[in-house]
Amino acid sequence: YQTDAYNGVFANGASRYLSHDLTDLIQSNIVRDIRTLYEPRWTRRGKWNQSYYEARVPRVPTMLLELLSHQNFADMRYGIDPRFRFTVSRAIYKGMLQFLCSQYRMDYIVQPLPVDHMALRMIGENEIELSWKAVNDPLEPTAAPEKYIVYTRIGNGDFDNGTVVDKNSYRTVLPAGIVCSYKVTALNKGGESFPSEILSAGQAFNSKGAVLVINGFDRISAPADFVAPAPADTLLAGFLDDLDHGVPYIKDISYIGKMKEFRRSIPWMDDDASGFGDCYGNYETQVIAGNTFDYPAVHGAAILKAGYSFVSCSDEAVESGQVVLNDYTYT
């Protein structure tokens, strides 16, 4: 941030030290959340009041954030993990929200986290019930959901504009012979959560029986990494895409290729020999597929074509006993 330009005030006459307040709130949220969820010893570094162009020229509160170094292996083990990215992004958002609300003397409310424990079940010949559980945010008590939005997709179409519901379940008519899919978002006065996984159901004509599809693939993660055993731990380390590429959230556009330089002592020499961490560049223009959380519809279409009706649920709904497997016939 920078406080001296334009005689120390913004265009509306407010003090440029508001940039310091914005910086402090964002940094405080990031450090607190990382220490709580990942690394209790995470270092909180200083704030700089310096004349960087990006901080000096804007006539609104501004801050520059440098969190991780791409040349630091320990940093990048966090930096390419989609779960860590979400935590930090949400912390930045919370800091901005707290700053804006403080300017207008308003209580802030953080948008909820996505719901989980989702399940679909047949409750009649052509009716289904979708249920789920709210996820409370242990880092932010204001993020509790108040309502939910259920989005519906018929066949291969797109999702509709959603139906607002007040409770943790939703009943609807299920047309025969077509796959219907559902996702849920949580809602409060702070906004709308990220969407849930997508569940699907289908009612077959002259159904031979009912099949339960358990959506077990809910993983997102960074790729496999290693540090050589001591005393070679200072010599070799890196990421092993061939062992485990990791799973992006939805998709990834930052991946350029697998790592090829694992020697920690090798310095940067030029862009074609960039030292420890050097990667191939054969994926620079590619979009890498991630977890879409939209798989029951794929299996359900085949099940429906075979003459069986189907419903689906999340794996945590089975683990918690919300869905009882004995309700379904084993063949």
Please tell me what each predicted stretch does.
Residues 1-15:
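A short, glycine/acidic-enriched catalytic loop
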Residues 15-49:
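Active-site-adjacent substrate-binding region
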Residues 38-105:
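Active-site-adjacent mobile loop/cap segments within catalytic or ligand-binding domains
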Residues 98-143, 176, 190-209:
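Pro/Thr/Ser/Gly-rich low-complexity, intrinsically disordered linker/stalk tracts
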Residues 147-151:
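Beta-strand signatures of extracellular beta-sandwich domains
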Residues 160-167:
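Short beta-strand segments within Ig-like beta-sandwich modules, predominantly Fibronectin type-III
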Residues 171-193:
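Beta-strand-rich modules
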Residues 197-329:
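Aromatic-Pro/Gly-enriched surface loop or interdomain linker
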